[in-house]
Amino acid sequence: MDLKNRISKLKILKKELQKSRSEILKALEADLGKSMEEAYLSEYLMTLEELDYTIAQVPKWARPDKKPTPYYQFPSKGEIHYRPYGRVAIAAPWNYPFLLAMVPTIGALGAGNRVVLKTSRKAPATSQVVQDILGRVYDPEEVLVYGLDPQDRARFMAEDMDFLFFTGSTRVGREMAKLAGEKMIPCVLELGGKSPVIVFGDQDLETTAKRIIWGKTLNAGQTCVAPDYCLVQKDLRDPLIQAMNQAIQDFYGPNPLESPYLASIIDQDHFRRLEDLAKAQGLDMEGKAWPQGLKFAPQVFPADPSSPFMEEEIFGPFLPVLTIDDLEDCQKVINLHPNPLALYLFSQEEKDLNYILDTIPFGGGAFNDTLTHLSTVTLPFGGVGQSGMGAYHGKYSFDTFSRKVSILKKSRKIDLDMRYPPYENFDPRKFFKK
């Protein structure tokens, strides 16, 4: 798809998104129990921001990059040209079924690719909306959407593809990496892991608590970069827990299960998994679980590294709080798990951030906030190690979904004979310093 045509189609897509806003928000409410406000802020608005940014910037991104050439190539010019891979396969998860289907699709289309998209059957209402919107803008040869049929996963994996982009669990990510290897194509894996939030040094505990609880309870904790557990100095643990419990009450009222702003757990299997963890931890669940509505009241509680909640990514509104003596202790706890997708540090000192950056590998994060790096279109988003590989968003999506073609332009006016054989009279010391 040439540049003019892809921009034109993206502008039409924007109009379709705006016309379908109510339909999108209702679908997210049906699938995940999200309030209209949360669905708007965390999925619809972020998708629109990505689309606007891509439309505005893609003409600049698509221009060849000029590069210097070494003296022994004189006279010449170097260029990097950006070309689409061809057909990009994108597998989207259920937890942000609109955002995480549309944003990589926008990036792939902006780079001139065709797309085959697989949405999640766990979010059927949103999957249908995504399919309908894209179907009104693109022909099936340009964008093909799978997701609602039980056989769609197998059909998706059997499709011809030149690039694979997957968001989801590490377990399925391994399957997708194997698929990419079998097809001999590049892939990006956006996975998950246990993302810590560290609270260190003097704090405005009220603001710190609000930002942590917001990041933890958005989408009922079903966010790949949600704070999974908290590490805090011993003398701050109890005041911080008290402040976080107050934030929960401020956000969701005295009975969070009745709040319209608390999203649901996706299905009974995930609900039972979280319920079993809570029981194993010994948490008081009376009045804090609603099986029929698939909801849990958010809970913050003291824990240690042996906690059942520390065995795997939680993906729910439960926050274990562990104590540390210093930042070296953070390393010890974090290194018990694979590299996290995100890390959050609350501190007054920039040197604390530099220490974390120098000693702990993680995908990305925020300093004195949570989640917000994910919604910043000018920053790349991606993991490291078992939390993923590759990155996207904005310009980084364009780069990810583009082949880099190197071109050296050589002048015909000057031709140095020394490059050609025979070399009997060639003395490299006359021409090269090495």
Question: PLM features: what roles do these ranges have?
Answer:
Residues 158, 191-193, 223-225, 258-259, ...:
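Short glycine-enriched loop/turn motifs at secondary-structure junctions
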Residues 246, 295-434:
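Conserved C-terminal structural/oligomerization subdomain of aldehyde/semialdehyde dehydrogenase
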Residues 71-207:
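Rossmann-like NAD(P) dinucleotide-binding subdomain of oxidoreductase/dehydrogenase enzymes
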Residues 138, 172-305, 367, 428-432:
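ALDH superfamily catalytic-core signature
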Residues 14-17, 21, 32, 55-62, ...:
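Structural signal for hydrophobic packing residues in well-ordered secondary-structure cores
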